[in-house]
Amino acid sequence: YGESVASVISQIKAISNDLENGLDREELQDTLKPGAARNAIDCALWDLQAKIDKTPLYNELNINLSNEITTAMTLSMDSPKKMAAESFIYKTYDLLKLKLGAKDVLESIRAVREAAPYPKLIIDANEAWTLEQIKLWQEELLSLNVSLIEQPLPAGKDSSLSNFEHMVPICADESCH
C-alpha cells in the first residue's frame, strides 16, 4: 500500500532522535501515520516496556492466555503441487489461508485439501476473480469445505456482490483501505 522497506526505514530514522528522547506509544500515534513503521515501533515499545517491567508482554497487555485465539497459517501463491507440499506440513492446524490469483484456483485448493483434509480454509483471491468465476466455482468451493473467500473482486467492484446469493461467506480486504 505504497510502502517499501526503504520508506519504512526512512520513517523510523526520521524519528530516531524523538525515540531516544523518550517518545512514548501515545505520542507515536500523532507522530507517524498508520503503517509498517509506526506498527514496528509500537510493537518494539510494548516489548521494551515488558522487559523493563520484567514481565511477559501478554501480562503487560492484560491478555489471559487461557483463552486461545485461532489464527491462520498463510500459504503463499505457488503451483498446486508446491502449495500441497507446504500444506502437508500444517495439516494438523485448525485454519489455513491460501493466497491465490486467477490461475490454477480449483487445482490448488483440491491439492491442498488432499494434503491437509482437516483445516478450515480461507481463500484470499487477491482481487483476481470475476463474479462469473465465483458463480461457477462456488459449489465446488463449498464441497472442498472453504470457510471464507477474501476479496475475490477488485477493490471498488464489490457492489456486484450485493444481490449475489453466495454459498461461501465473502469478506473484504483491499476494499477497506
Regions found by a protein language model. Name each.
Residues 1-121, 128-135, 139-143:
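N-terminal capping/lid subdomain adjacent to the active-site entrance of alpha/beta enzymes
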Residues 56, 147, 169:
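Residue-level detector of anion-binding/catalytic polar loops
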Residues 72, 122-124, 150, 169-173:
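Structural detector of well-ordered beta-strand residues that form the stable sheet scaffold
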Residues 102, 127, 153-154, 176-177:
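Short, glycine/acidic-enriched loop or turn micro-motifs at the edges of active sites
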Residues 144-158:
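A short, conserved beta-to-alpha structural element at the edge of catalytic cores
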Residues 156-177:
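Catalytic alpha/beta core domains of metabolic enzymes, predominantly
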